Design a protein with these regions (language model features):
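Short, acidic/polar N-cap/turn motifs at the starts of alpha helices
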Residues: 18-20, 200
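Cysteine-rich micro-motifs
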Residues: 33-47
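Structured aminoacyl-transfer and RNA-binding surfaces used for tRNA recognition/handling
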Residues: 50-352
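Short, intrinsically disordered linker segments that flank or connect zinc-binding domains
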Residues: 2-16
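Residues immediately within or flanking Cys/His clusters that coordinate Zn2+
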Residues: 20-23, 27, 36-37
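Aromatic-lined, polymer-binding surfaces characteristic
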Residues: 355
Length: 356
């Protein structure tokens, strides 16, 4: 953040009187209109307070949330395109599609070229990631597959650059979803991937990161780079998190898999307690920012929530298993239907682990 005027300042921040602040705890820079805020979203007292108390004016389930996002961007000049396969056949260096921008990246030698079917566009891209498999089912927010809302633009006569991107994302939250303006916080960052990178603004509500607007303009890495011939807007947001924010359920799994998990809970004879789950998973979310060891996160959340051994064994542990099973089944369905198979080699090994 050595040059915030060059990399992070956008017109919206002047129009809405956002102030740039440094987090009192971690020193990260962020933008807010809340004059009383002293910490970034990761270290605020209201972190994950939307659980049990959603801050949006409307309630949308998983499907409805996408329809709201899609209608907003289409209304604002974007073309909605269908998702690409989760099996990334157009990239030799990737087994699976890990982000929406991957749909449009073409690697030619040492150069990355972007091919957009429309400009600007929005895409509901299913992505597969296996880095945090041990967290799935336990944390309330980790998935092995998820839908990334991709907002992409090339800043030419048809598209746009930073100012309009951030303005659209802000209006999506405040107008389409009814979030109070004071709840929206933008955090400065840099995003690197696929051989290109740029400054980025992550946007949060109640401590939940909903999306990350990346202003891709460099090729290489932070130690050795050059300017790209083509600038790219690469905003990726989690659809699951948008639905979760509006529903305020104990976990993101509840609003994404609700009818399925409810049926499995009934079949298993598990009687859940919403008040208990809201308390427990709020503690889990907060402790994730403090501890890197998942077992420590879980142990501290159990202690903070005051759970008994009986509640852990009869409610929490079985519930974690159901969440994991439903998540893994969804991932396998996407992967197999798009042409991948569980195996002992390559990306198929990840699927084999999940199936087992």
């Amino acid at each position: 953040s050595a040059d915030p005027e060059r990399y992070y300042k956008v017109k919206l921040f002047d129009d809405e009187r956002f102030e740039r602040k440094s987090c009192a705890t971690c020193k990260r820079f962020y933008w807010t209109i809340d004059e009383n805020r002293v910490n970034c979203p990761d270290h605020s007292d209201d972190t994950y307070s939307f659980i049990g108390n959603p801050p949006t004016a409307k309630r949308f389930d998983y499907t409805q949330a996408w329809k709201e996002v899609e209608s907003f961007f289409v209304k604002n000049g974007h073309t909605s395109v269908n998702r690409y396969p989760v099996v990334c056949r157009w990239r030799d260096d990737l087994y699976f599609t890990i982000a929406s921008i991957v749909d449009f990246q073409r690697v030619m030698g040492s150069k990355v070229v972007f091919e957009f079917p429309a400009n600007p566009l929005v895409v509901p891209q299913t992505c597969l990631r296996f880095k945090d498999l041990e967290n799935v089912g336990v944390t309330g927010r980790h998935f092995s597959s998820f839908c990334m809302i991709g907002q992409h633009s090339i800043p030419n006569s048809n598209g746009y650059w930073k100012d309009e991107c951030v303005d659209l994302d802000y209006r999506l939250l405040t107008e389409q979803f009814g979030v109070d303006k004071k709840e929206v916080v933008f955090v400065e960052d840099v995003w690197e991937g696929g051989g290109s990178f740029g400054s980025s603004l992550e946007f949060f509500v109640k401590g939940l990161e909903l999306g990350n607007a990346v202003f891709t303009e460099f090729q290489g890495d932070l130690s050795n780079y050059k300017t790209l011939d083509q600038q790219i807007i690469d905003m990726g947001a989690g659809l699951e998190r948008f639905a979760w924010l509006t529903m305020g359920t104990p976990t993101a799994y509840d609003c994404c898999f609700g009818p399925i998990t409810n049926n499995l809970l009934q079949q298993a004879g598990i009687d859940t307690n919403d008040e208990l789950l809201v308390t427990y998973f709020t503690k889990i979310a907060k402790h994730l920012e403090q501890f890197s060891d998942l077992s420590e996160v879980r142990k501290n959340a159990i202690k903070s929530a005051g759970l008994s051994d009986e509640q852990i064994n009869k409610i929490i542990t079985p519930l974690e298993g159901i969440y994991l099973i439903v998540d893994h089944i969804r991932t396998l369905i996407f992967a197999i239907s798009d042409g991948a198979l569980p195996s002992n080699v390559g990306g198929g090994y990840n699927l084999r682990i999940m199936l087992r």
